[in-house]
């Protein structure tokens, strides 16, 4: 993780062996990514972890079994919304965890003190799971529709544009000749 010491920033291990100031970082932004990929993964995991205190609800909500359940609920919801047309794959676990943390922080704060039974825990987890599914489903539906449109565009033949049509009426109308005008008199 980055440590700010006044105007000096320490980079991840392996990136560089000296501290650089923010001006030097702006000149060479790629320096951050010179470290090993595992260092970057550790930093991102640290940034997301320790958001809330550990409780029975957080243990159950973030359990692998509950994540599998949420994955199944998402797949089922998209299948129903597309009227059985599309069966999607499981979503990226890291992305799902980010949404779960967001939903947990918004909806589960203060619930830990009010728990008196297992039924309450089940109801709270079910509500949190539904909120996660409701949060991610619209984005997934947009992606499904975009993908279907893309596949249709790629695999259907290109319809050429019609040739241009001259819609001008110039030269089609004419005035009566002068001799016919004077001959009627």
From Swiss-Prot:
Domain of life: Viruses
Name of the protein this chain belongs to: Uncharacterized protein R409
Lineage: Viruses, Varidnaviria, Bamfordvirae, Nucleocytoviricota, Megaviricetes
Organism annotation: Acanthamoeba polyphaga mimivirus (APMV)
């Amino acid at each position: 993780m980055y440590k700010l010491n006044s105007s000096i920033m320490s980079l991840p291990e392996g990136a560089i062996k000296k501290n650089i100031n923010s001006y030097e970082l702006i000149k060479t932004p790629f320096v951050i990514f010179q470290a090993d990929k595992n260092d970057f993964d550790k930093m991102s995991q640290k940034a997301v972890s320790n958001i809330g205190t550990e409780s029975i609800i957080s243990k159950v909500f973030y359990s692998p079994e509950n994540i599998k359940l949420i994955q199944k609920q998402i797949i089922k919801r998209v299948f129903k919304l597309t009227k059985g047309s599309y069966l999607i794959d499981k979503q990226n676990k890291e992305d799902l965890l980010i949404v779960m943390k967001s939903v947990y922080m918004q909806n589960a704060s203060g619930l830990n003190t009010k728990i008196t039974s297992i039924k309450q825990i089940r109801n709270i987890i079910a509500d949190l799971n539904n909120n996660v599914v409701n949060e991610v489903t619209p984005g997934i539906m947009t992606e499904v529709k975009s993908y279907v449109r893309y596949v249709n565009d790629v695999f259907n033949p290109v319809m050429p544009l019609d040739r241009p049509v001259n819609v001008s009426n110039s030269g089609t109308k004419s005035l009566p000749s002068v001799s016919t005008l004077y001959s009627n008199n």
